Amino acid sequence: MAARRTRKDDGSNWTVADSRGVYGIRHWGAGYFAINDGGNVEVRPQGADSTPIDLYELVGQLREAGLSLPLLVRFPDILQDRVRKLTGAFDANIERLEYQSRYTALYPIKVNQQEAVVENIIATENVSIGLEAGSKPELMAVLALAPKGGTIVCNGYKDREFIKLALMGQKLGHNVFIVIEKESEVQLVIEEAANVGVQPQVGLRVRLSSLASSKWADTGGEKAKFGLSAAQLLSVVERFRQAGLDQGVRLLHFHMGSQIANLADYQHGFKEAIRYYGELRALGLPVDHIDVGGGLGVDYDGTHSRNASSINYDIDDYAGVVVGMLKEFCDAQGLPHPHIFSESGRALTAHHAVLITQVTDVERHNDDVPKIVDLDEQPEIVRWLAELLGPTDAEMVTETYWRATHYIGDAAAQYADGKISLAQKALAEQCYFAICRRLHNQLKARQRSHRQVLDELNDKLADKYICNFSVFQSLPDTWAIGQVLPILPLHRLGEEPDRRAVLQDLTCDSDGKITQYVDEQSIETSLPVHEVKEGEDYLIGVFLVGAYQEILGDMHNLFGDTDSVNVYQRADGGIYHAGIETHDTIEDMLRYVHLSPEELMTLYRDKVAGAKLTARERNQYLDALRLGLTRSAYLS
């Protein structure tokens, strides 16, 4: 076990249990992630009762196998465990409530289209699982990957070719539903069904008035991009009736948005949605499926709350609401119980992937107490700050902080006015940060009057840990929508994390940093970390990145894909890896933006030939440039 260190607040020894609390891993880990007694993060890919894998040791093994950091590690066993948990929750509620139909989980591949992800999800045994496609490329993929007889739901904007492909899929033996999102799609379905010679299975997506509170609320409600209004719904039904295809209308679909934090919001919208089921049945349509869309969230921050990055319910609660409300409505109306679909892609995939990187550099404030040999000769503002360097009574801690903050503001203004020199400004800043560090050590989070100042000091005193990755490529949602992802060191968790840091990436962009961190059961602006030792590879893991992050990542500054690998666990607890994908090279990235490496080499040769270099230097330069094109954009 790692050496224990002293805790600041009460003098007791720091233990692994303290780190488990600080990083909240029990709350967001969902039984898959924990901190072992040796102070390393472990993963249990087959659930809380399965054999643990030491993640820090695993990274060492993968690096020995030739992989480099940053590294995306996928655990496909987690995918299958998530499928079993989701389908198990619905099946249990169906049995408990005596619901007279069944449930099929749909995986919307837009969440993560990686082959290993899709294949492992649909390979889960003894469950009912289907696929959803929202574009022609996705439809082409699922037509190939779905097992014969498997369910395929087609959403999104559709042209004639899209609809023809979907109908061909039906003739190939798939259970295909074409969901009408826009009135303009109706005529295309009618015409292509005649051309292909098949009775289409149609779904109707309704646009609900109800809105859920989430970062993706705009996907629901009256201003939603997709779905039919009440008037449009009646018009579409009539057009299918006139074409003699109304008996192919088999599915009702709605979507309230992704990551719905509050289950009560979902209940409110679902109450509206199931009214449409009753109305469509009353119109004589044989609707016997209901696709409740997405919304099942992930507790990213572990607070089990209505925070945007959390949920105040679990999978069983969600399944109970869907099954229970449907049964109650159908029984009251004398309607058959419909087959239930849900598109819970985030809940299925988020946990299975971890991004691992290392700290490459540390930038910290100089908060050592300065030695001032000529204090009397310093400007008044410096003398005032120097007076605050001494001991401070406990009851004066916050007052001292506010005074010091006022003084450092004055120092900045005086420098701008030319009243103090650069050296004097630097001395004032060193005094200020030394005061802040000392006061920080006196503050106690348990004392309410200290909390505001403590939060500010945690922010001001945070080190900058430069890490070997790109926020824009690997964690785009943290930048784009302020998504909170759990982050912690992979090792040294038997030691007290005695520093706080903001993680910054390699990009030449001020937004290339992570600004929110899970800290116990709250969100903070900096992360508790350890001081990086000389020559140490200090490894950081970013967890729950399996949903959307890979496919949404962009190439800002031409940082491309990282190394990635799929790690599987055998029945005996042993592991093996497969599906290794190496990082994009600089050459790959240049080609993507239509810069030909061959043309660049020609230009390099011209420049080298025109430079005042020896023959040996020319060869060395050309070799270095040629080799550079084959390297990773990330640091080696």
Swiss-Prot record:
Catalytic activity: L-arginine + H(+) = agmatine + CO2
Modified residues (N6-(pyridoxal phosphate)lysine): 110
Keywords: Decarboxylase, Lyase, Magnesium, Metal-binding, Polyamine biosynthesis, Pyridoxal phosphate, Spermidine biosynthesis
InterPro entries documented for this protein: Ala_racemase/Decarboxylase_C, Arg_decarb_HB, Arg_decarbox_C, Arg_decrbxlase, De-COase2_CS, De-COase2_N, De-COase2_pyr-phos_BS, Orn/DAP/Arg_de-COase
Cofactor names: Mg(2+); pyridoxal 5'-phosphate
Record GO biological process: arginine catabolic process; putrescine biosynthetic process from arginine; spermidine biosynthetic process
E.C. no: 4.1.1.19
A Pfam short name: Orn_Arg_deC_N
Binding-site residues for substrate, renumbered to this chain: 290-300
Function: Catalyzes the biosynthesis of agmatine from arginine.
UniProt cross-references to NCBIfam families, sorted A to Z: PRK05354.1, speA
Family: Belongs to the Orn/Lys/Arg decarboxylase class-II family. SpeA subfamily.
Protein name as it appears in the record: Biosynthetic arginine decarboxylase
Protein source organism: Pseudomonas aeruginosa (strain ATCC 15692 / DSM 22644 / CIP 104116 / JCM 14847 / LMG 12228 / 1C / PRS 101 / PAO1)
